[in-house]
Amino acid sequence: MRINPTTSGPGVSAFANKNLGHIAQIIGPVLDVAFPPGKMPNIYNALVVKGRDTVDQPINVTCEVQQLLGNNRVRAVAMSATDGLTRGMEVIDTGAPLSVPVGGVTLGRIFNVLGEPVDNLGPVDTRTTSPIHKSAPAFIQLDTRLSIFETGIKVVDLLAPYRRGGKIGLFGGAGVGKTVLIMELINNIAKAHGGVSVFGGVGERTREGNDLYMEMKESGVINDQNLSESKVALVYGQMNEPPGARMRVGLTALTMAEYFRDVNEQDVLLFIDNIFRFVQAGSEVSALLGRMPSAVGYQPTLSTEMGSLQERITSTKEGSITSIQAVYVPADDLTDPAPATTFAHLDATTVLSRGLAAKGIYPAVDPLDSTSTMLQPRIVGEEHYETAQRVKQTLQRYKELQDIIAILGLDELSEEDRLTVARARKIERFLSQPFFVAEVFTGSPGKYVGLAETIRGFKLILSGELDGLPEQAFYLVGNIDEVTAKATNLEMESNLKK
């Protein structure tokens, strides 16, 4: 591990033996820098511009070398605003790529793309840092066993299970529960797997980043009394940042996650919100560097950039990084090159439905639209596969019958269809679950439901053994035993009212 010259140095003196160049041209966030002959920096090296602007305010801008232009010039992309920079300013070549702090010191803190804390809680120990540019693990290091990553969330584990070390796409509009689902996953991986999480906010709203931080503190995911007990590190490069920062902030978050996997040998959850913004920032940088655009104006290196990020997210013999990536689909066009390139890397999709959220069924995961490559008998076993398929068939039949019910009512259905509808409504409600992180809102204690318990519960509903229980007994409970207990309580309450 190498000390990060951009975040740990006691000033320019730390770079005394480094290459010195000067700014030759400034085009927005792109700088052309001239260096002495024979002293050119490498691609991806971090350059630091230090000096004072026209009103004598200190300037400290870090850039990353993207192109060697010839004539002893390089073209670099700035990681922060270039306001106040002038031609002729001195530029220091740090001789290394951007490096960021890693390890336990990152938990409970918010960082920017450079690994600098931005939460006003003081400096971070930067003795252990890691460069953000690395190659993906070699084939021989990979753990190729197909294993399920149990989340404790019934609808996910049963119908669209996550792969350990896999990549999951999270699709959903505003206000359907993405944030709460993300926080519950962070909470559950810490409790059940002893793992940690890294959240990369890539090109999204600053307000949402702040709301997430506040909600994490409120729900205990971040312990502000003792930060080392927190379960998550946050890395933000929001909408207002230059494209260079938005393009690299995903790599900063990934580097922190890799340390937990490779050195601490933990299971890590890596959230990227939003993977589309990573592509969008790359497109902006590509245009600024003068590359010829490809389809729909995207960068010609789209697949390469996406692949270099996604291939580092994997399981090794030491631990795993399981990634959940929010995917924005521009104009709902799934054939757009950005989401289409993302889909090629995904093992599962979790689709959140506004219709279910409107019914009050949380998590509002759509059981029919969500998919997983893991849902195969040879991976999950015959019992799990059969149960999941029967649940989907029942819900699909209910969906087909809804138009008839809306026009003619339940009474016009056949006896068999009425039974299907009754069981489907129970299944729909049993797919809801009280979350630990939502205790403060709902007043119901959170429930972690193991996969075996989940399968047992749905098998009992499908077998007809619970046909006599009321629908509301299945709503917002953990395992199936709680359903029978709740049904007994409901019956006692109704008897008392009589």
From Swiss-Prot:
Keyword Protease: no
The entry's keywords: ATP synthesis, ATP-binding, CF(1), Chloroplast, Hydrogen ion transport, Ion transport, Membrane, Nucleotide-binding, Plastid, Thylakoid, Translocase, Transport
Membrane disposition: Peripheral membrane protein
Subcellular location: Plastid, Chloroplast thylakoid membrane
Catalytic reaction annotation: ATP + H2O + 4 H(+)(in) = ADP + phosphate + 5 H(+)(out)
GO cellular component: chloroplast thylakoid membrane; proton-transporting ATP synthase complex
GO MF annotation terms: ATP binding; ATP hydrolysis activity; proton-transporting ATP synthase activity, rotational mechanism
Enzyme Commission number(s) from the entry: 7.1.2.2
InterPro entries, per the entry: AAA+_ATPase (IPR003593), ATP-synt_VA_C (IPR055190), ATP_synth_F1_bsu (IPR005722), ATPase_a/bsu_AS (IPR020003), ATPase_alpha/beta_chains (IPR050053), ATPase_F1/V1/A1_a/bsu_N (IPR004100), ATPase_F1/V1/A1_a/bsu_N_sf (IPR036121), ATPase_F1/V1/A1_a/bsu_nucl-bd (IPR000194)
Record carries keyword Membrane: yes
Residues annotated for ATP binding in this entry: 172-179
Subunit field text: F-type ATPases have 2 components, CF(1) - the catalytic core - and CF(0) - the membrane proton channel. CF(1) has five subunits: alpha(3), beta(3), gamma(1), delta(1), epsilon(1). CF(0) has four main subunits: a(1), b(1), b'(1) and c(9-12).
Family: Belongs to the ATPase alpha/beta chains family.
Function according to Swiss-Prot or TrEMBL: Produces ATP from ADP in the presence of a proton gradient across the membrane. The catalytic sites are hosted primarily by the beta subunits.
Designated name of the protein: ATP synthase subunit beta, chloroplastic
Organism annotation: Citrus sinensis (Sweet orange)
Gene responsible for this protein: atpB
